[in-house]
Amino acid sequence: MQQSGQKGTRNTLQHAIGPVLVIAQFFGVLPVAGVWPSCRPERVRFRWISLSLLAALILFVFSIVDCALSSKVVFDHGLKIYTIGSLSFSVICIFCFGVFLLLSRRWPYIIRRTAECEQIFLEPEYDCSYGRGYSSRLRLWGVCMLVAALCEHSTYVGSALYNNHLAIVECKLDANFWQNYFQRERQQLFLIMHFTAWWIPFIEWTTLSMTFVWNFVDIFLILICRGMQMRFQQMHWRIRQHVRQQMPNEFWQRIRCDLLDLSDLLGIYDKELSGLIVLSCAHNMYFVCVQIYHSFQSKGNYADELYFWFCLSYVIIRVLNMMFAASSIPQEAKEISYTLYEIPTEFWCVELRRLNEIFLSDHFALSGKGYFLLTRRLIFAMAATLMVYELVLINQMAGSEVQKSFCEGGVGSSKSIFS
């Protein structure tokens, strides 16, 4: 009954994050076939001829064109903090789309290896609350992060609409509301094309897709890491059930083999996802540094103020979620090693000692291309770096609060998330 309870709810990574990946494909992210929750991992395929890949390539090429046009704006108007925003965003989106395109070719292999390892944790021996709630918990994480991203984008749109209204009223512009709105928000695009209503759906889709992929790098890593954490929690639960019992060598040998399978899967994640990890840490640090710089300047009206602080808070919470999700894996492994020491000395055997040696010798952590490990120590290191940066800004920018004239017009009149 327990076995059917776990398998009946299909608590696998494919089933858990399938709905999120289906949404992601609409925005050109991870274009692979067979990601529906009901599909078996064996049916996951990367296809060169598919609508999802076509959408991904269109958005990737569009990001490159957008980057080139944003570069022209910077060259024409100078390298300023308010002109480089769109360029920075385009460059980051190019890397995001590019990394996910590369990952999509490896995703069928990753999800099949994941499914093979997960069969172990669907057995009755691992039937606990972590296993039974695996899919629902991951989906809850996904929904919460996507809703938070939607709220952040909504505050951006609200701020942009309000500023567009103020520009027309206060600057006495003789312009159509929506035409002025899109020309303010996507100025670089209208360097090469004229505004017509037919462009609005395409502009909105590309804007939403670029915003989505900017968010999804962290969301995807959170889901993968939380899923891996719960598998370690299942193993911890099983060990704790027998911590006061003298178990035979065969029991600890089975645990050790399961741990090695889990460690191999973590090694695959480390190899295949390290590019995403480097990208996430890099663009999040850049964004937070830019926003800290802006916190010393006037943000304008109340809509800009609301968006600025909401966006900054959201990104900090998002990156902390990603960092804590990744660092929870080595932390859970460390907790298991602590539990092993609760076993009385007279109950120790050869296989238990071997199991303990694995926990002592392996770090069980994801890395960024081998340059750094995603542990709690890294979180404090990044926080310390940001604090030093803020102290330098406090010293350099005291009394330098300047607000650009609202009716200056031209480049920089809109509020990019990076400017």
Swiss-Prot record:
The UniProt entry, under InterPro entries, shows: Gustatory_rcpt (IPR009318)
Please classify the protein's predominant subcellular localization into one broad category: membrane
Q: Which domain of life is it from?
A: Eukaryota
Q: Which UniProt keywords apply?
A: Cell membrane, Membrane, Receptor, Transducer, Transmembrane, Transmembrane helix
Q: Which residues form the signal peptide?
A: none
Q: How does it sit in the membrane?
A: Multi-pass membrane protein
Record has Iron as a keyword? no
Q: Please verify whether the record's keywords include Cell membrane.
A: yes
Q: Which GO terms describe its biological process?
A: monoatomic ion transmembrane transport; sensory perception of sweet taste; sensory perception of taste; signal transduction
- The transmembrane segments are 16-36, 49-69, 83-103, 140-160, 205-225, 306-326, 378-398
Q: Name one Pfam family in it.
A: Trehalose_recp
Q: Give GO cellular component annotations, separated by semicolons.
A: membrane; plasma membrane
Tell me the compartments it is located in. Answer: Cell membrane
- Record topological domains on the Extracellular side: 37-48, 104-139, 226-305, 399-419
Tissue-level expression reads:
Expressed in Gr5a-expressing sugar-sensing cells.
Q: Which residues lie on this side of the membrane: Cytoplasmic?
A: 1-15, 70-82, 161-204, 327-377
Q: Name one GO molecular function term.
A: taste receptor activity
Q: What does this protein do?
A: One of the few identified sugar gustatory receptors identified so far and which promotes the starvation-induced increase of feeding motivation.
Family to which this protein belongs? Belongs to the insect chemoreceptor superfamily. Gustatory receptor (GR) family. Gr5a subfamily.
Query: What is the name of the protein in this document?
Result: Gustatory receptor for sugar taste 64c
Name the gene behind this protein: Gr64c
